[in-house]
Every structure is written in C-alpha cells, then in structure tokens.
C-alpha cells in the first residue's frame, strides 16, 4: 500500500487497475524467498492499458504535487550488486501537470504494443521483472506505487528437432549407448530415451538421469554459476548386464522449469543439461552431460497474434570437474 500520511492516517492511496483485469490470465512466479506470487500475464507486443486511481481517504485534505506519471519498466537486478539495477525498458506517460488534488481522481493510461524482449525470471542471483510504476512527485518525498506484471516469451522451432545419440564409456570396463528423442523440449514435453549397455565389466549399483539447471551471471572473471538439480529420474537400481536396454521417460511439466535463456541483455543465462550418472560398488560416480534447450510453447489462440522469438542453438557443453566423465 502506498499513501501520504496526514494527522489521522493516510490522505490517499494509489491503485492500478488494468482494463482487461477480468479476462486476462494470471501466472505464478516463485520469489527468491521461495514464496509464490501471482500477477497478470503478458506477452511481447501486447499493449498495457488501464486506470490509475488516486483515492482520498480524508475528505477536505489537499495534496500538492509537481506532476503525476506512470512508467512501464523492465529491469534486471543482480542480487550481489543490488545498487546496480539495469533498466532495459522504460516508457513514461505523464498523467497530470503540477497542481493540487482535493478529491479522488482517475487517470487513463495506455502503453501501445510494448516490446517485452525477455521472460520474467527470479533465480539464485538475479531477478528480471516488469512492473508499472506510478509516481506522485512531491517537494520532499515522492509517493510511489509499483505494480508487478509477468511476461512469458513464446518460441517456435522448425519441424527438424534432431535426437541426441551418443556412445560413451570407460576403456575395457564400460561401454554404453544412450539416446534422447529430441534436443529441444517445450515445458510440457516428455523426455523419452533409452540406455543400451554394450559392455559391462564394472559392477554398477545405481543409475539415474538428472535435469540440471545452470544460472550464469556476470561476464569475464566476475562470472558466477549456480547449479541446481531440477529433477532426478532413477533409471535402474542394481547391476545391468551386457545387451540390456533400459527405457527413459521423464515428464518435464512436473518440475516447472523456466525456458532456456541465453545471454539475457549480456547479464545472465539459464541453461539446462541432461546428466547421466552411474554409481559403482565402490561408490564412485561417473557421469555424462548433454545440453538441451527448453522452450515455452504458444497456445493455439496465442499463435495467431503474438510475436515469437527463435532461440539460438546451444553451444557445446563443458565437462564438469566434480566427477569423472564417462
């Protein structure tokens, strides 16, 4: 709540009401504290329109101001440097010239076909948010109200979506072939694949498939990478034999990941990897990582009216030094 204090409480409050609030879809986003917030959902190119209501709580009071404005803001904030926020979108509409308010007032606003180039995101070290910001400019302290929105980026891909197929192993000890049905998956997709054991001369006790998220912030020597295991899928528990084939079926939607986000405004990236992990009887861990792309598929009714952003092909993943690679 934003208000200007008088002797007996707030003189006024600021409200922001969207014109299509009754019909516009609401989406959820998880904050850095783990709480879930709900806000109205927008796509790139959509207009943002509504009313700003200045509601007086104390009849007879006066509010002198040096102008009233509303801004549409797209902002990136790095948590390790909160003093250095970057605005990649800032549109301003002047609602009122300097003057005096003595009663409640409503102001219409509209930002036409607003460019929203990135998806809303809150991660371990970075937040990308969109919001409407109403400011009543005053001599000493401005009166400010922020109203958060959520933006989803929709992507389309050509029909060609190559499968991932690799043979990996440890010389004279283990040789396996794994295959995933695609290299790009939408957020409601299913990862389907199989593991085929060509040679088994070490005793494998456990095998699992992990969906790994890597959030990379900063550039150059100041780069920070946060790694999170989004999902684990147990492929087998026990020793495999030569010639054995084990199917994989991992439902992505159950883990609610974000899309792949690459080099967002030269501030951060979010990348996803499938990590195949094997554990032998001496508790040694072997792994093989393969990068995949996650993308947000457009509903049919949205496809006809929304601009899409084609994603870049992923770069070759780098091997981790934490565990021996297969």
Swiss-Prot record:
Stored InterPro entries: Arrestin-like_C (IPR014752), Vps26-related (IPR028934)
Q: Where is this region: Disordered?
A: 306-326
- Enumerate the UniProt keywords alphabetically: Cytoplasm, Endosome, Membrane, Protein transport, Transport
Q: Which residues lie in Low complexity bias regions?
A: 315-326
**May I have one GO cellular component term?**
cytosol
What is the superkingdom listed in this entry's lineage?
Eukaryota
Asked if the keyword Cytoplasm belongs to this entry, the reply reads yes
Give the UniProt subcellular location, in the record's own words: Cytoplasm; Endosome membrane; Early endosome
GO BP terms in the entry: intracellular protein transport; retrograde transport, endosome to Golgi
Please state the protein's primary subcellular location. Answer: cytoplasm
User: How does the UniProt record describe the way this protein sits in the membrane?
Assistant: Peripheral membrane protein
The entry assigns this protein to a family as follows: Belongs to the VPS26 family.
What's this chain's function?
A: Acts as a component of the retromer cargo-selective complex (CSC). The CSC is believed to be the core functional component of retromer or respective retromer complex variants acting to prevent missorting of selected transmembrane cargo proteins into the lysosomal degradation pathway. Retromer mediates retrograde transport of cargo proteins from endosomes to the trans-Golgi network (TGN).
Q: How does it assemble?
A: Component of the heterotrimeric retromer cargo-selective complex (CSC) which is believed to associate with variable sorting nexins to form functionally distinct retromer complex variants.
Q: Could you identify this protein by its name?
A: Vacuolar protein sorting-associated protein 26A-A
| Upper lineage | Eukaryota, Metazoa, Chordata, Craniata, Vertebrata
